[in-house]
């Protein structure tokens, strides 16, 4: 019977596992998806509250032709950002600035973009690359808060090849590299640009993927199931392709038991904790100003890495008359906060908030999400692990997730497209 041997065995039903399983089902393949929790979605989730929507992780995904195709196949309508969310701020000298660089820093950036080779040197950290190509001012005021908001990492430990390699492939200037990448990327001329979501948040996309897999007659999702070992899967389903999409730590555990070459990476590759808090209130954080959010450089006096202004980003995110913000804490430079109690985290948030606004807006509610090991540290050890995967994984086994050459949901989606549609998992 066909059900006995699916085309794919997928371990982990977070965003990555659901995505690979859905792409397989859309191609008419069968999938057995194993998930140790009693629900799918992993880190990503959308919770409806009386005050509005809460996103437990990412608040959106960069649009691409791949996302538009996927949404169309699942019958979903993409939601674009509001015009008023166009402005993005970085905190500088006591206020949110759209352009935090001095005149001299700006000249240095222009010189770097046009005149310095952006080629990444062996073992170079993002910090070293940034200082060399863009100058110290840009690193401190733009690159550090910008990448800190995405990777939550310390730029001095972050591998430039791993974090920036997707954008830089030649010896030319940064401008030349970016132009070359833009030429390669397939575009739909009518494509909506920038960050997008769905009416019910990113959870709507995850629910639709889950429903698609469940509706496939030869596919099945097994919840509350500890992952079977690689050897037992290969024994039971010798013809099935295997996709590990269960996060860095669990993937390493499974790989190490099957292939000794990966054992050393269990100790070397680390993850970071992240805390997100969505706060509902009656007043907008920036008064009459609006925008996407504010990033806080490490020396700006804030404990938060940044804050998203949810009410300005997507329509329908709050109930009438309310406003919502999501503060993000933790990462490499603040590993203690994941150990805090919810009440302590809320106090930290309210103290940070007082530094932004003078208005005394009583909070209506806070929704705290603590991820003790959410994000991989994008360091040289992780780069080596990725290269080892490219070299040593046997045919028919794939290891995927936010540690594979790109941390964001859009990077995972683009890579999944290459693996599933073109069987190009190597970079």
Label each residue range with its predicted role:
Residues 16, 39, 249:
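Conserved Rossmann-like nucleotide-cofactor binding loop
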Residues 7-33:
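N-terminal Rossmann-like FAD-binding beta1-loop-alpha1 element of flavoenzymes
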Residues 100-102, 289, 310, 314-427:
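Conserved flavin/dinucleotide-binding core of flavoenzymes
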Residues 50-120, 125:
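Dinucleotide-binding Rossmann-like beta1-alpha1 core, especially the glycine-rich loop
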Residues 25-48:
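Glycine-rich FAD pyrophosphate-binding loop
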Residues 27, 225-338, 356:
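Mid-domain catalytic core of redox enzymes
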Residues 12, 82, 217, 221-226, ...:
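Short loop/edge segments at beta-strand edges and connector loops
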Residues 111, 118-233, 237:
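Active-site/ligand-binding neighborhood in enzyme catalytic cores
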């Amino acid at each position: 019977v066909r059900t006995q041997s699916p085309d794919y065995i997928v371990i982990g039903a977070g965003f990555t596992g659901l995505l690979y399983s859905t792409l397989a089902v859309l191609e008419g393949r069968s999938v057995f998806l194993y998930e140790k929790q009693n629900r799918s979605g992993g880190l990503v989730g959308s919770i409806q509250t009386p005050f509005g929507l809460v996103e437990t992780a990412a608040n959106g995904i960069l649009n691409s032709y791949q996302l538009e195709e996927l949404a169309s196949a699942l019958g979903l309508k993409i939601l674009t950002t509001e015009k008023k969310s166009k402005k993005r701020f970085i905190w500088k000298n006591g206020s949110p600035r759209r352009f935090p660089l001095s005149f001299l820093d700006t000249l240095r950036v222009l010189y770097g973009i046009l005149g310095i080779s952006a080629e990444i040197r062996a073992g170079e950290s993002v910090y070293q690359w940034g200082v060399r190509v863009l100058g110290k001012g840009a690193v401190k005021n733009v690159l550090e808060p910008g990448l800190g908001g995405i990777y939550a990492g310390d730029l001095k430990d972050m591998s430039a090849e791993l974090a920036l390699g997707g954008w830089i492939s030649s010896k030319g200037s940064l401008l030349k590299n970016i132009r070359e990448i833009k030429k390669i990327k397939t575009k739909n001329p009518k494509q909506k640009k920038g960050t997008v979501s769905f009416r019910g948040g990113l959870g709507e996309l995850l629910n639709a993927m889950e429903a698609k897999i469940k509706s496939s007659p030869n596919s099945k999702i097994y919840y509350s199931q500890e992952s079977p070992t690689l050897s037992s899967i290969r024994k039971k389903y010798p013809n099935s392709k295997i996709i590990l999409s269960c996060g860095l730590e669990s993937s390493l555990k499974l790989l190490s038991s099957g292939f000794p070459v990966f054992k050393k990476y269990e100790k070397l590759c680390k993850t970071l904790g992240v805390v997100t808090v969505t706060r509902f209130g009656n007043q907008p954080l920036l008064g009459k100003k609006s925008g996407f959010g504010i990033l806080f450089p490490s020396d700006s006096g804030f404990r938060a890495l940044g804050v998203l202004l949810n009410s300005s980003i997507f329509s329908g995110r709050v109930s009438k008359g309310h406003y919502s913000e999501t503060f993000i804490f933790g990462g490499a430079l603040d590993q203690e906060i994941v150990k805090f109690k919810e009440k302590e985290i809320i106090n930290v948030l309210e103290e940070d908030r007082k530094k932004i606004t003078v208005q005394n807006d009583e909070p209506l509610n806070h929704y705290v999400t603590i991820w003790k090991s959410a994000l991989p540290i994008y360091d040289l050890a992780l780069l080596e692990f990725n290269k080892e995967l490219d070299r040593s994984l046997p045919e028919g086994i794939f290891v995927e997730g936010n540690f594979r050459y790109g941390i964001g949901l859009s990077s995972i989606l683009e890579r999944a497209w290459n693996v599933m549609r073109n069987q190009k998992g190597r970079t």
